[in-house]
């Protein structure tokens, strides 16, 4: 099965892959951030949003993965094999979990549309040859003010209101009322 965990949120694994692996904070930092910002909503029995649900699932999945890694570490006799398993989990699974946690925390913090615009902006920036792109990559927290990505079908917002049309300078002609209609 080809399952993309970002599909229902308007993103793709490929879109997140444009961000380098060292872009994502450590799992510990992301878990601390999620706990500090969203602990009440994550622990609540109420459904808050699809991002909260996905974040809960990613946190639970990471916990189970750490339980498995501990079990393997304690039960695998060969140190070289143990090292291989730990490296695989940290490199591959760790990156996927860091991407998931970052995406859903960012969606909850900045809004899904802003995060998607950021991913597209970064993807365009990273694919542009260095000689032709700005020296600094887009920054998520400043994106709403500086984004150049526009949604299709909408005209850009104008900074000043458009001038109002002037009415004709000639006085309006009033219908003359007949004396009988004044009663």
From Swiss-Prot:
Q: Positions of the sequence repeats?
A: 155-161, 162-169, 170-177
Q: Does the keyword Signal apply?
A: no
Show the InterPro entries listed in the entry: Hepatitis_core, Viral_capsid_core_dom_sf_HBV
One Pfam family linked to the record: Hepatitis_core
Q: Where is the composition biased (Basic residues)?
A: 149-176
Question: What ranges does the record give for the region RNA binding, renumbered to this chain?
Answer: 177-183
- Provide the GO MF annotations for this entry: DNA binding; RNA binding; structural molecule activity
GO biological process assignments: microtubule-dependent intracellular transport of viral material towards nucleus; symbiont entry into host cell; viral penetration into host nucleus
What domain of life does the native source organism fall in?
A: Viruses
- Matching Gene3D superfamilies, A to Z? Viral capsid, core domain supefamily, Hepatitis B virus
Query: Which residues, renumbered to this chain, carry the PTM Phosphoserine?
Result: 155, 162, 170
Q: Where is this motif: Bipartite nuclear localization signal?
A: 158-175
Q: Where in the cell is it found?
A: Virion; Host cytoplasm
Q: Which UniProt keywords apply?
A: Capsid protein, Cytoplasmic inwards viral transport, DNA-binding, Host cytoplasm, Host-virus interaction, Microtubular inwards viral transport, Phosphoprotein, Repeat, RNA-binding, T=4 icosahedral capsid protein, Viral penetration into host nucleus, Virion, Virus entry into host cell
What does the PTM comment of the record read?
A: Phosphorylated by host SRPK1, SRPK2, and maybe protein kinase C or GAPDH. Phosphorylation is critical for pregenomic RNA packaging. Protein kinase C phosphorylation is stimulated by HBx protein and may play a role in transport of the viral genome to the nucleus at the late step during the viral replication cycle.
Tell me the segments the record calls region 3 X 8 AA repeats of S-P-R-R-R-[PR]-S-Q. Answer: 155-177
User: Which residue ranges are recorded for the region named Disordered?
Assistant: 136-183
Q: How does it assemble?
A: Homodimerizes, then multimerizes. Interacts with cytosol exposed regions of viral L glycoprotein present in the reticulum-to-Golgi compartment. Interacts with human FLNB. Phosphorylated form interacts with host importin alpha; this interaction depends on the exposure of the NLS, which itself depends upon genome maturation and/or phosphorylation of the capsid protein. Interacts with host NUP153.
Q: What does this protein do?
A: Self assembles to form an icosahedral capsid. Most capsids appear to be large particles with an icosahedral symmetry of T=4 and consist of 240 copies of capsid protein, though a fraction forms smaller T=3 particles consisting of 180 capsid proteins. Entering capsids are transported along microtubules to the nucleus. Phosphorylation of the capsid is thought to induce exposure of nuclear localization signal in the C-terminal portion of the capsid protein that allows binding to the nuclear pore complex via the importin (karyopherin-) alpha and beta.
> Per the similarity annotation, which family is this?
Belongs to the orthohepadnavirus core antigen family.
Protein name, as recorded: Capsid protein
The source organism is: Chimpanzee hepatitis B virus (isolate United Kingdom/LSH/1988) (HBVcpz)
The gene name reads: C
